[in-house]
Amino acid sequence: MIASSHYKALLKLGLPIVIGQLGMIILGFADTLMIGHHSTEGLAAASFVNNVFNLVIIFATGFSYGLTPIVGSLFGKGEQKAVGCTLKNALWANGLMGIFLTALMMLLYANIHRLGQPEELLPLMRPYYLVLLVSLIPVMLFNAFKQFADGITDTQTPMWLLIGGNTLNIIGNWVLIYGHLGFPEMGLLGAGIATLSSRIIILLTFIGIFLGSKRYHIYRTGFLQGKLNKPDFLQLNKLGWPVALQMGMETASFSLATIMVGWLGAMALAAHQVMMTIGQLGYMMYYGMAAAVAVRVSNFHGQHDTEGVRHSSSAGFHLILVMAVTVATPLLLLRHQIGGWFTDNAEVTLMVASLIVPFIIYQFGDGLQCTYSNALRGIADVKPVMYIAFIAYFIISLPAGYLFGFVFDWGLTGIWLSFPFGLTSAGLMFWLRFRQQTK
């Protein structure tokens, strides 16, 4: 029997993370709407650049997740000064990763004209790309502070900062895209500058809170007294790279599935995009709660409390299942109307309706893999996660998508039927590994 205290603690920790994640989705919707209303060309250019940067930011966020189990374990042991020292090393590691990714993205920028994009969009893409590139290092440094705060169970500070940052971003969009309050009308470039500004502001605000808050006093002491050291730096890389690769592979597999959908034509691609937008909503909610599982598990792991580790992960999965049912029920009931919210095209609306059932089937697997990949992160057992992700997404899911979609000729529905196979197999393998490690 799992004590109700586990559910209460997870909700208290997880809901602020979920709210922060939902804020990111709302910002994505707002960006798309505001750029789209300014110009169709701007929207097309933003679509390409944002897709490239989303993959990089997901990879970068995954790397920063290596900090959570270290901080959570030290916090569980009551070693607050060591937490501050670890944060110093995490800022160093994340900063270097930011520089590495920036250099990589500069290489891509130099070859952007070779990527087969419409010539007329390149003058819009280039400045927007560069402005987002400048924001990459602030994102990495903010992520280090966020994972530190999550690890010491302070999930509310990052939540309020993300809400504030998103609000500033939307206001900045309104001012700079359309040219309000005396500013010139900058279109897509304005959206990029608004994003960069909000990312710098929330980073500087978090630094100010860390340096001035009484709550962080003991961690600040550890931060100032602690030294950059090789063991902490190597441990952060040892935990960060596998999580980054796991999250990157999951995202890449969905991107490759999108390429297969493109072979079926524009209508299939439009229906796929609608469902991916809806799917992201569920995924972000699950991942927010699963991040709380990682924190709780790491706290109990630091105390060598195996029962607490297992009960926390089970309670997290139960809460995510409740979320999945909450998401799936209205979608099932409204499956014939959903497509019409996004488009007037009757064919696309019918296709969207046909994808709801495979979407609902994979919610169980998505919840399972979110929970137990994060539970494994909590006990710092991350290397197998990378191998499992490769097997599930590249050996099982993508070939199944091709088989169902094109060999069996089930089309778009066939490609979507491969997602439950990939996500559920990943979830089961993560769960089995977690059970083995927590006997």
Give the ranges of each region predicted by the language model.
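N-terminal transmembrane alpha-helices
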Residues: 2-33, 37-38, 54-66, 70, ...
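Transmembrane alpha-helix boundary/anchor motif
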Residues: 30, 66, 103-107, 116, ...
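Short alpha-helical transmembrane segments in multi-pass integral membrane proteins
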Residues: 1-17, 71-137, 183-241, 297-362, ...
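Transmembrane alpha-helix boundary and packing residues in multipass membrane permease domains
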Residues: 17, 21, 32-33, 69, ...
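Helix-terminus/linker motif at the lipid-water interface of multi-pass membrane proteins
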Residues: 22, 26-44, 112-119, 175-188, ...
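Small-residue-rich hydrophobic transmembrane alpha-helices
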Residues: 43-106, 139-158, 258, 271-335, ...
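Short runs within selected transmembrane alpha-helices of multi-pass transporters and secretion channels
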Residues: 64, 132-150, 158-166, 191-207, ...
